[in-house]
């Protein structure tokens, strides 16, 4: 399955919520009618079956993190193998992706932009360039912007916006150095309550 590169509003309307695909700090334009399905004359949403609700939640989470279907299934399989809550394990794996950590540290204003920075070798982990967006960052890892990329306007602007909104508690960021430390994968209580990972567990348990 190819990565979706079409209108972000269309995806948000399909899921009925802002997925923050355009920016975590700016809400979608008011013209994006989240209560209607995609299309010029998007119909109001009908009642979904239990399966439909579970599928929509799985798609919503997958799209928030920008993960392809096969990758998402692999993350779920790994979450099952680990001790503890499968749903929470899944979110920790997604939050530990390098592109997501770069986004959380404010080096990219969206996860898509952060993924591009990683792919273009603009990000360093523990002193080594890493260009794999799915790379799993570990507690204590230091993530920084490569020296030659520090003057990129999108990074400077993204970091300024992130500073205004504040950084998540599970990362510490030195904005002047454009460097941050991944303290640990976040606890469930630190993440958005708009996500219901248990529905994903139920979806794959059928």
From Swiss-Prot:
One of the Pfam families matching this protein, by short name: Ribosomal_S4
Domain of life: Bacteria
Start and end residues of each S4 RNA-binding domain: 96-159
SUPFAM superfamilies: Alpha-L RNA-binding motif (SSF55174)
Entry-linked InterPro entries: Ribosomal_uS4, Ribosomal_uS4_bac-type, Ribosomal_uS4_CS, Ribosomal_uS4_N, S4_RNA-bd, S4_RNA-bd_sf
GO CC annotation, single: small ribosomal subunit
Transmembrane segments: none
Protein name: Small ribosomal subunit protein uS4
Organism: Chromobacterium violaceum (strain ATCC 12472 / DSM 30191 / JCM 1249 / CCUG 213 / NBRC 12614 / NCIMB 9131 / NCTC 9757 / MK)
Protein's gene: rpsD
């Amino acid at each position: 399955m190819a990565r979706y590169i079409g209108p972000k509003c269309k995806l948000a309307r399909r899921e009925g919520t802002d997925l923050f695909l355009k920016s975590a700090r700016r809400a979608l334009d008011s013209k994006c009618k989240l209560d209607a399905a995609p299309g010029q004359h998007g119909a109001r949403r009908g009642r979904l079956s239990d399966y439909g609700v579970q599928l929509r939640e799985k798609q919503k989470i997958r799209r928030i993190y920008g993960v392809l279907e096969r990758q998402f299934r692999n993350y779920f399989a790994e979450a099952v193998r680990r001790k503890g809550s499968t749903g929470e394990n899944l979110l920790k794996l997604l939050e530990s992706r390098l592109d997501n950590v770069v986004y959380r540290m404010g080096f990219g204003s969206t996860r898509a932009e952060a993924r591009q920075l990683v792919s273009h070798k603009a990000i360093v982990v523990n002193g080594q360039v890493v260009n794999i967006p799915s790379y799993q960052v570990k507690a204590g890892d230091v993530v920084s912007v490569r020296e030659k990329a520090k003057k990129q306007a999108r990074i400077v602007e993204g970091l300024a916006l992130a500073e205004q909104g504040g950084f998540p508690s599970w990362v510490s960021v030195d904005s002047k150095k454009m460097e941050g430390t991944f303290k640990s994968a976040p606890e469930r209580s630190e993440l958005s309550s708009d996500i219901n990972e248990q529905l994903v567990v139920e979806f794959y348990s059928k």
